[in-house]
Amino acid sequence: MIRYLLSKLLLIEAVLLLVPVSVAVYYRESSQVFTALFSTIGILVLLGGSGILQKPKNQRIYAKEGILIVALCWILWSFFGGLPFVFAGQIPSLIDAFFEISSGFTTTGATILNDVSVLSRSLLFWRSFTHLIGGMGVLVFALAIMDNAKNSHLEVMKAEVPGPVFGKVVSKLKNTAQILYLLYLALFSLFVIIYYLAGMPLFDSFVIAMGTAGTGGFTVYNDGIAHYGSSLITYLVSIGVLVFGVNFNLYYYLMLRRVKAFFGDEELRAYLVIVLVSTGLISLNTLYLYPGFSKSFEMAFFQVSNIITTTGFGYGDITNWPLFSQFILLFLMGIGGSAGSTAGGLKVIRGLILSKIAKNQILSILSPHRVLTLHVNKTVIDKDTQHKILKYFVIYSMILLSLIFIVSLDSNDFLVVTSAVFSCFNNIGPILGTTSSFSIFSPISKILLSFAMIAGRLEIYPILLLFMKRTWSKR
């Protein structure tokens, strides 16, 4: 069943590659670009087609199979998705291309390119299109369109959807996937129109809207959003990424006119408070660097919204910011957006629960015989869920420190190494304080950071389990 489903997923990627083909046709690009795209499509059709010839008798997917499908799908899609860049000679290194598209599908936005203008329009579009596909999840997308989305596919969706608790918004899983994607695409379309009306060229509007929707961060120009020189666009992008950093289940509540459930959500309130407080502190701390408070606030709001939602759209160099402001951004890198959103990171809900666990622990010392319960949104969080979150945090911290230790062999700059690892593992994007690329790192570090991006997007376990002997043993 694993081989059969992976083959179908490779065929889906082949179909998706027809989108950049149409862009190449529109812009009348070189034959080399068409050869690169069709060669990749041919490889995917050959591999995918050979794998679906024999349909498995047992189509049930268990937890182990679900995890393997998710992990292998993301790795394979990233590998094959990078081939057009290699074949076209625009990113000659296979490792660099794998890094670039891993960054795309995981909506990280980290790049090895020093100059994005080397990319043709079609591959520039494909690069950002991977943000749109990966934003809600490659498998959620596949589940929304596949004809055999049975309840057993719950294990696939649970392994991919970010957050400590997975919940279906409606009874049928396929309907859940379709509703989530319809909401997602509706908001994406809205921002394409908004950006176009704000003065962006149509091509740019699509590229930036895809980066906004997926909270990715790939742009059309080397200087990122600063290229447009518009405060209106800066604010619109900031608001846009914050919109996509919210749990999509809450938007479904709004559709059902459950306004109280939307605004009463504890994670949403904590998310907005963190954004406002961080923006306020940085605005005041960097006030002396800008002509007035309005510009200081604009820059602070842009950076905070982009970092907490793990988007990473570039806007100039902030290395001249005070260390206090840079450490706030580093702190936000660890938090991330909401569970069930397109944002990466540890997630606000986990931070909220961890803070409540710490509070209860302190209270239990003061009152040893007092029975303490933990509530989020008036729902009791049982001990099992609390322990799972604590275990996740421990594993997350151990991997993060290990990555920093290994990648530090490439650089003596603590802030660069730390922020690079935070950026990749939390799917944020650029190295803190600069819009420069990840080309400074060695091939080994790039491979490591590529897997860190995929692991971070899938919340660690699926990639971690690939390296366990028991995962590959027969049932």
Identify the meaning behind each predicted range.
Residues 1-475:
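Membrane-proximal intracellular helices of multi-pass ion channels
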